[in-house]
Amino acid sequence: EEEIRERMAAFEPEAVHIATEGPIGIATRRICLEWKLPFTTSYHTKFPEYVSARFPVPVQVGYAYMKWFHKPSGRLMVATPTLRDELVKHGFRNVSPWTRGVDTELFRPDLKAIFPADWPRPIWLNVGRVAVEKNIEAFVELDLPGTKVVVGDGPAKADLEARYPDVKFTGAMFGEDLARAFSDADVFVFPSWTDTFGLVILEAMATGTPVAAYPAHGPIDIIPGSGAGAIDDDLRTACMACLNLDRQAVRAYAEGFSWRASAEEFVRNLQPQPEAEKVKFWRRLRRLARLRRRAAAA
């Protein structure tokens, strides 16, 4: 915590945003409250559901912690209207939208194929951390024609690989190779119920690959009416519906999620200090830091 305190004092931020509810986020939150600095936060992970999936911890306990953490935030940023509505029902305040963007230059259609030519088509792809909360087993156990591929690594990979020998587990991919994997697939399958958005959905769409998913947070805000994918309580039904979609239309839809729009929305949501207060505050803090250093050296 002392290192965070020193870095903030040296950097003199115009605004503070806390992107994690973990140890670094807790320390930064405590410093901001101590210094009476306004700050914003964001809700990237359905933490209560993740913890409940891994350990015998009731979801309500996780939500109690998250409400405590985000309560002093000037603005809690969330990726989708559906998540905003759910958090408001749980008693969260100051909830504001912050949509996501995708790198449409890296993730683009018609990249060089990366999967072996002898893998039967269609190729059904999942990308992400291979962990129980991602619900990947719902994908790999589907009865689908062609080849199922999982790109990524994680604690559940060895177990799934042993139990589903017909599925291709490639390990992690990055950069151009990852973009090629998205582009080479026929359908991207997103089986998670616990993500708050699912950036991989946009990455797949940017390459022209349609997305099949459950009607969960993220997919339910991105896919319906887009012509870029399908959602259904029966994941196989959603998968098969994607085979007939126009890949050019999928790409065109993804182009509406730009990094510029996402960045501008983020900046609008920040809670900077008024200029006059900021100058006085950091001047006072620098003076206190000098006094502390002198006392420590004495």
Please state what every model-predicted region is.
Residues P38-T40, E49-W68, V78:
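Nucleotide-sugar donor phosphate/pyrophosphate-binding loop at the beta->alpha transition
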Residues K112-I114, L243-R287:
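A charged, aromatic-enriched C-terminal amphipathic alpha-helix characteristic of glycosyltransferases
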Residues Y63-K112, W119:
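Donor nucleotide-sugar binding/catalytic pocket of nucleotide-sugar-dependent glycosyltransferases
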Residues P210-A213:
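Short hydrophobic beta-strand element within catalytic cores of glycosyltransferases
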Residues F115-V149:
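Conserved donor-binding/catalytic core segment of Leloir-type glycosyltransferases
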Residues E21, W193:
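Aromatic "clamp/platform" in nucleotide-sugar-dependent glycosyltransferases that forms part
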Residues K157-E176:
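Nucleotide-activated donor-binding/catalytic signature segment of Leloir-type glycosyltransferases, i.e.
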Residues M8, R180-A185, F266:
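Short alpha-helical donor nucleotide-sugar binding micro-motif in glycosyltransferases
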